[in-house]
Amino acid sequence: MRQERITETVSERSPLKKTKAYRQEMKNGAGLGKDCAVLCAGLKTSGADQDIVVSKWIGLEGTARLAGENYERLRERFPARMIEEAAAFDRYLSVIPEAATAMKSGVCGIQAVSRGGIFAGLWEMAEEAGVGLEADLRKIPVRQETIEICEFFGENPYELLSGGCLIMTASDGNALVTALLREGIPAVVIGRTTRGNDRVLYNEGRKQFLNKPRW
């Protein structure tokens, strides 16, 4: 059976109940959102030689959609508890808490991750700031549920719809991570911005370049 791409909103026929917060995030586009955009007004632009911090996990929104729309198909391989947990990733879609904390903790730039996943988000952040970047693919945070469901559907988790995740830059990424963790928000430094235009990912010694998003 041909797999459908995730471009529609979550089906109301899904066997898993959608939360009010999730529906509101879908209405707002699951990006920074109007409230968060106001919060971040006046923020400095990312520059070279800054740490790159990622909040929570990539692929949250896409995983929630895939799990919610394909419960019965996924049950052929996975336990119900795992599918229900994946569908409940919608509870992580608001990025206002981490943006608010980041604004008080030395953040220089904030990029919402959404369409095209973390790969597109990193490229867009670097393009807008006019910088390059180097990042370690193994440090990019991803839930096991996302990996399993992406493998089932032949999706790339690094290109999966990723509302609920922010890319942030800071002169001291470790201090920003500490501030976020103190508020109960998972975060990790995955790399640094660089001078020049090369956007490079490293994976166990192998080097690859990020491409411009295809849309």
Identify the residue ranges that each predicted region occupies:
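Acidic, Ser/Thr/Pro-rich beta/coil linker or hinge segments at domain junctions
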Residues: 2-21, 183-215
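Active-site-proximal betaalpha loop/short-helix elements
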Residues: 86-161
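Glycine-rich anion-binding loops of enzyme active sites
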Residues: 1-66, 192
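A short beta-alpha structural unit
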Residues: 163-169
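Solvent-exposed alpha-helices and their adjacent loops that cap or buttress functional pockets
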Residues: 20-25, 43-47, 101-104, 127, ...
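Beta-strand->loop->alpha-helix junctions that form or flank phosphate-binding loops
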Residues: 113-114, 132-141, 159-161, 177-204
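Helix N-cap motif at beta-to-alpha junctions
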Residues: 169-175
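Short, compositionally biased
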Residues: 64-81
